[in-house]
Amino acid sequence: MPVPFATARPAARYDVLAPDGSQIRFLPQVPGGSMVHCTLPPGAVSLAVTHRTVDELWYVLAGEGELWRRQDGREEIVPLRPHSAHSIPLGTQFQFRNPGTEPLTFVIVTMPPWPGMDEAVRVADHWPPPK
């Protein structure tokens, strides 16, 4: 059976707060993956998590921030800047923050599609939450 076409624009108000605290706006999905628009407000720090079953690809649209990720003895902090792309392979611990004055926005593709709120498992934070 053919998969229906889908076209979407991010909603003005977010659809859900992700388990890490970021604002999620739903975009199209197909059987192999789903897409969302993610926003982290200025001064915000996400909660550190790892995923149970999904890989993610991020593409930064606007704002600036930092991404911490760790997996199998590898660890790094990389800048999140417009037109940069980042991978979050299954089993990676990660956290991101927006120290800037503008919202940090990016598109996330999740493979397979995001299964629900229990997908993200809390891990120890790399950065403490803002006070």
Locations of regions flagged by a protein language model:
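Ligand-binding loop in jelly-roll beta-barrel domains
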Residues: R81-P82, L90-M117
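A short, N-terminal "cap"/entry segment at the start of jelly-roll beta-barrel domains
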Residues: M1-H37, L47-A48, D118-K131
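Short acidic-glycine-tyrosine-enriched beta hairpin
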Residues: D72-L90
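Short hydrophobic/aromatic-rich beta-strand segments that constitute the beta-sheet cores
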Residues: V36-H37, L67-R69, F106
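A short beta-loop-beta micro-motif enriched in histidine and acidic residues
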Residues: Q23-S34, G43-Y59, G73-R74, P82
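Histidine-centered metal-chelating micro-motifs
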Residues: V45-L47, E66, S84-H86, L90-F96
